Design a protein with these regions (language model features):
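Phosphodiester-processing cores and adjacent nucleic acid-binding clamps
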Residues: 1-144
């Protein structure tokens, strides 16, 4: 088991968790993998990778992104599958100035696992809450 949505103190004002404490806690819980998905930034990636190696756990590197499609908010977590995916996350994080377009998310999602993420305030959550199958289906088609 692994938590696939973990923010660190590099997600300013969103998490007080220091990377080493996060890794040690996950290891104490018996996890062999630890995931980092800071919000719109990747400043902690190198430190995270080095600490994971130091503590003999497998790093999963990701990015939490706010996006806009048809003037509606969407929220995603992208996890790098390989080095190319990691490079794409670096590129995406370097252009983020608030929300990024859905097209930019799609462009840089290659070689990444894409998850929806929400605090219940994005459009995808509204589609689910209102069981709007037509809009859900259309959205899934866009993501293919």
């Amino acid at each position: 088991m692994v938590h696939l949505h973990m923010r660190s103190s590099y997600s300013l004002l969103e998490s007080p968790i220091r990377l080493e404490n996060m890794i040690l806690h996950q290891k104490q819980l018996g996890f062999n993998h630890v995931c980092l998905t800071d919000h719109n930034v990747m400043y902690g990636t190198m430190e995270f990778y080095q600490l994971c190696k130091k503590h003999n756990v497998h790093p999963i590197i990701g990015l939490e992104v706010d996006s806009i499609y048809n003037e509606e908010p969407f929220h995603f977590i992208l996890l790098a599958k390989n080095d190319m995916g990691l490079q794409n996350l670096y590129k995406l994080s370097s252009i983020i100035k608030g929300n990024v377009s859905f097209e930019e998310v799609i462009k840089y999602a290659k070689d990444c696992v894409v998850l929806t993420s929400s605090d219940g305030k994005d459009t995808f959550s509204e589609y689910i809450e209102h069981q709007d199958l037509e809009k859900l289906s259309a959205f899934v088609e866009l993501c293919k």
